[in-house]
């Protein structure tokens, strides 16, 4: 169903494009040998190149180029064998050279595509316009001193991939799905860790509104939004603001805006620059970047199985629904965990335990699968205990809760607590006789035609045996006894 804003003059459509700045996983910066570790002491990872000392020349880091090419291949994008680095000129205190090295007209990666998995089970393609390499700026710290701004250049020179989407998204939910899918692909590839809270993946949000079928409206760009939730909120607020502005007789100005999460609103930051404002020109210190097709082919051979392919395989090989397969492949570690659990077992039962029980429990405590106290082999062991009749499904829930708390193996918990399923027909006979004796009136009702009471008797017997009785045996013996 289309996402439309109901204005006073009719329905308005949102047009969304996203520019994602993804920090490249690399031990060194794009043009210097300085380290890139997060959380280092201020200005402790800065080379003379990063600080723009006179006479210092940039030398390209091949690993960063390889990571960009790998990402382009993961996005099914065109890899340009010749690309050019340009100087993007602007002044800011945390940009010591007075320019950023970026790629303007000839990026390393061209058109690509991402397939979104939406909440209603449908999919949608979003085009990738380009991916280019550039260096990050430093960081200005305004909250360290009442009257001074401090500058930390640790981030200056760190390699970024700017991944620019086409304006193909039409709702905040699609934008969120795009960011989640892009982050998943980057993590599968190992080219960016996607940690938005650390700033290694940041998003600029381009929003415009129009009446359905009309030309694109004037867009605004909301800079450096650092969580998927904030991206959704910024889109909702900005689209509503533009509709109200236009319907009130105003005009949307092409400008750069800032998202204020405390107030839940965007606010004007500066007028939006055009490309000519930056006076782009090829960097005279860097030759055009030329790569060989054979090198690209070698990188392609090293690509892992990507989320879309893995999802299709899970559906085909394991018989999983698109929804369950989508949840399992959303994180590479999660998919690997599931495959270990499912090996040699009922794949749908394994999916139920991983998604319904384990992920549900981890989500409540804000943990992901890599922090699970239950190992994949141990969860598989719990499933084995249920399928071979050692414990009942009811007891399995108690064992699972204990595993979650202690990390102990399921077999040890079962033995220690005496939870083995009761298959002794004599013991089950006795429990049934006691339940029937205590509920003689209900036995009479059952025998007079109230067969729905059968479930009541099963529940009473299971309670009497503390859930340990074999359900199939209980059903069989109980049915015989109740018939008299």
Swiss-Prot record:
One biological process term in Gene Ontology: glutaminyl-tRNAGln biosynthesis via transamidation
Enzyme class label: ligase
PROSITE patterns (alphabetical): GATB (PS01234)
Keyword line: ATP-binding, Ligase, Nucleotide-binding, Protein biosynthesis
E.C. code: 6.3.5.-
Keyword field contains Ligase: yes
SUPFAM superfamilies reported in the protein's UniProt record: GatB/YqeY motif (SSF89095), Glutamine synthetase/guanido kinase (SSF55931)
Reactions it catalyzes: L-glutamyl-tRNA(Gln) + L-glutamine + ATP + H2O = L-glutaminyl-tRNA(Gln) + L-glutamate + ADP + phosphate + H(+); L-aspartyl-tRNA(Asn) + L-glutamine + ATP + H2O = L-asparaginyl-tRNA(Asn) + L-glutamate + ADP + phosphate + 2 H(+)
GO molecular function: asparaginyl-tRNA synthase (glutamine-hydrolyzing) activity; ATP binding; glutaminyl-tRNA synthase (glutamine-hydrolyzing) activity
Domain of life where this protein originates: Bacteria
Summary of subunit composition and partner proteins: Heterotrimer of A, B and C subunits.
Function: Allows the formation of correctly charged Asn-tRNA(Asn) or Gln-tRNA(Gln) through the transamidation of misacylated Asp-tRNA(Asn) or Glu-tRNA(Gln) in organisms which lack either or both of asparaginyl-tRNA or glutaminyl-tRNA synthetases. The reaction takes place in the presence of glutamine and ATP through an activated phospho-Asp-tRNA(Asn) or phospho-Glu-tRNA(Gln).
Family: Belongs to the GatB/GatE family. GatB subfamily.
Protein name, entry field: Aspartyl/glutamyl-tRNA(Asn/Gln) amidotransferase subunit B
Source species of the chain: Rhodospirillum centenum (strain ATCC 51521 / SW)
UniProt lineage: Bacteria, Pseudomonadati, Pseudomonadota, Alphaproteobacteria, Rhodospirillales
